[in-house]
């Protein structure tokens, strides 16, 4: 995941499971790269690359305001203003989001919503053959979110209920980013782009630990456990952990674009380092007469008090070769040299080391792909590249990173008002790995580090169709995407305990999205979007277990949006998410 070509995850090498996603409202477009060309980027080079393009500095004085509210009292405001005057251009941007949430917390006056503030400033100097762009970003978020769920009986009675035990749960985070980009045209055929960047992310999710055990007991018929959840039974020793972590991600990257004849070359390098500082004290509460009473705090040691680092040096070389008028060939080569480490401390003052880990890996990642125009309407494509994903700071010295060989082949049709594409894909993993987090535990139950599942195969096909027709004054666009995927262990693994044929986690077999609409020259446009996601394993091997809790249920959602242009510069819209009120 990148923003404007810069790694935006909190710590992509030392802590790849860490989650952060920029405010999407301030993005102007989205780039998705797959196949051999994605080796221009990294570290993950298996499934694809997402590059978020932020709002550009306008060429002239321009402003924009969008204000949205909904039935629950949530508000979203997005505003930008910028200008270019002579050699100088600038942009100011902000997003302000506030929501009350939709869950009701027992015995609490706290809502289950969030507040988000995001600010961006850009300044650019443009010379005859070069430019310098500075970008500053700062955001903060407070979310009254929890991982605590409900018993089956309570969910069936009221899925929007939250137990009072989860009332203190709250996520607080801040993110700041700075980058300086220099672009230079050395000649008509050679240019370079160099970026210095740094991102800081601080978060503390204060939340109840161990609630899942109480819910499991209540599901098994334990009336005392149900009473604890309802607040009618007193209990002691409830642990509320400060899941506090600080991340730093920084580096410098440069890329040269060189055009020679029918070849477009990319040569580049990146020096990157990131870190995670985890310091997680625990507050102990008792529940007395339905209220939480503070008892004491426990200083962090071991896994709650650790420091992880990642250092990486990357090189890449790509050649986009227009071999003939009909044949285009992409050749790519990437090199990743990664060093990670973890240090756990036995005392809060970090004077005594409890344990250490370190891992070094160096991978050469080649790739090649092509497209060939059979006719003006028909095109075939194919490619193969080597995939790579680092394990993170929790990797031991003898553990190998995830690597794979990835093939794709397909055909495209371009018509006057019709586009269709079918692409088959196959990935052969010599060492499939899962990155563990509390939000997405690994198949062995771990909530940090990595879990090696062993050899695996992922195969499937993607289908895409776009067309449209006219009905009087209306234009009716239609688009359909469908993906079929099979993902399973390909060889028994004694270390992980997984067997050949067991399904991988988090990979639905069927996914589909259908979009249609009615567009009118008056500016009144209406769209309907239907999305389907199949059930999928929450831990590897769910196809060989008997419990329904080992996999999700399938989900089908329909959204509707209607937009009307009041003037050339102002419009209004109505959007209904989840039109049929599906909830699972």
Which residues make up each language-model segment?
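Membrane-embedded beta-barrel scaffold of Gram-negative outer-membrane proteins
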Residues: 181-185, 189-209, 373, 379-383, ...
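C-terminal beta-signal and adjacent terminal beta-strands/loops
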Residues: 430-431, 475, 532-541, 560-584
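Gram-negative outer-membrane beta-barrel transporters
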Residues: 324-325, 329, 426, 449-541
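Transmembrane beta-barrel wall of Gram-negative outer-membrane proteins
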Residues: 62, 69-98, 107-146, 170-187, ...
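Transmembrane beta-strands of outer-membrane beta-barrel pores
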Residues: 67-71, 85, 96-100, 127-129, ...
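Short acidic/polar hinge/loop motifs at secondary-structure boundaries
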Residues: 6-34
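Face-selective signature of the C-terminal outer-membrane beta-barrel domain
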Residues: 126, 131-137, 172-345, 371-373
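Structural signature of Gram-negative outer-membrane beta-barrels, strongest in the C-terminal barrel
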Residues: 247, 262-264, 270-274, 303-428, ...
């Amino acid at each position: 995941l990148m923003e404007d070509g810069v790694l935006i995850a909190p710590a992509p090498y030392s802590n790849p499971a860490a989650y952060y996603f920029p405010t999407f409202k301030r993005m102007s477009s989205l780039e998705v790269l797959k196949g051999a060309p994605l080796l221009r980027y990294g570290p993950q080079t298996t499934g694809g690359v997402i590059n978020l393009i932020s709002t550009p500095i306008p060429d002239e004085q321009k402003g924009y305001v969008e204000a949205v509210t909904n039935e629950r009292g949530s508000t979203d405001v997005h505003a930008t203003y910028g200008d270019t005057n002579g050699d100088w251009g600038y942009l100011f941007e902000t997003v302000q989001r506030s929501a009350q949430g939709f869950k009701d917390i027992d015995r609490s006056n706290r809502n289950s919503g969030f507040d988000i503030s995001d600010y961006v400033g850009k300044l650019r100097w443009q010379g005859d053959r070069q430019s310098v762009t500075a970008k500053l970003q700062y955001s903060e978020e407070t979310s009254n979110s929890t991982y605590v769920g409900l018993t089956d009986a309570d969910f069936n009675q009221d899925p929007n209920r939250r137990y009072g035990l989860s009332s203190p749960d709250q996520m607080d985070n801040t993110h700041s980013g700075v980058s300086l980009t220099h672009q230079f045209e050395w000649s008509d055929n050679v240019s370079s782009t160099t970026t210095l960047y740094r991102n800081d992310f601080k978060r503390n999710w204060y939340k109840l630990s161990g609630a899942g055990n109480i819910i499991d007991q209540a599901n098994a018929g334990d009336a005392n456990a149900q009473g604890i959840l309802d607040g009618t039974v007193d209990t002691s020793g409830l642990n509320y952990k400060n899941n506090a972590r600080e991340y730093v991600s920084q580096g410098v990257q440069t890329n040269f674009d060189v055009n020679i004849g029918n070849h477009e070359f990319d040569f580049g390098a990146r020096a990157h380092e990131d870190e995670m500082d985890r310091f997680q004290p625990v507050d102990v509460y008792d529940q007395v007469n339905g209220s939480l009473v503070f008892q004491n705090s426990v200083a962090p040691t071991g896994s709650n008090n650790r420091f992880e680092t990642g250092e990486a040096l990357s090189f890449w070389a790509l050649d986009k070769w227009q071999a003939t008028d009909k044949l285009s060939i992409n050749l790519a080569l990437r090199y990743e040299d990664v060093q990670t480490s973890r240090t756990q401390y036995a005392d809060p003052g970090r004077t005594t080391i409890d344990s250490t880990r370190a891992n070094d890996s160096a991978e050469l990642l080649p790739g090649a792909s092509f497209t060939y125009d059979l006719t003006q309407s028909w095109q075939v494509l194919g490619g193969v590249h080597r995939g790579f994903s680092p394990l993170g700071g929790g990797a031991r010295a003898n553990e190998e990173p995830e690597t794979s060989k990835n093939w794709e082949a397909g055909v495209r049709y371009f018509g006057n008002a019709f586009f269709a594409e079918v692409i088959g894909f196959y990935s052969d993993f010599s060492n499939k790995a899962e990155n563990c987090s509390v939000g997405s535990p690994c198949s062995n139950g771990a909530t940090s580090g990595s879990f090696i599942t062993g050899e695996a195969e992922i195969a499937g096909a993607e289908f895409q169709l776009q067309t449209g027709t006219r009905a009087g004054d209306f234009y009716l666009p239609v688009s359909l995407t469908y993906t079929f995927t099979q993902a399973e262990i390909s060889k028994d693994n004694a270390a992980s305990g997984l067997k050949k044929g067991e399904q991988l986690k988090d990979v639905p077999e069927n996914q589909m999205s259908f979009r249609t609409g009615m567009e009118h020259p008056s500016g009144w446009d209406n769209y309907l979007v239907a999305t389907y996601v199949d059930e999928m394993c929450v831990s590897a091997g769910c196809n060989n277990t008997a419990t329904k809790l080992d996999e999700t249920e399938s989900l089908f959602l329909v959204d509707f949006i209607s937009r009307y242009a009041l003037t050339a510069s102002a419009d209004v819209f109505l959007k209904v998410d989840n039109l049929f009120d599906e909830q699972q």
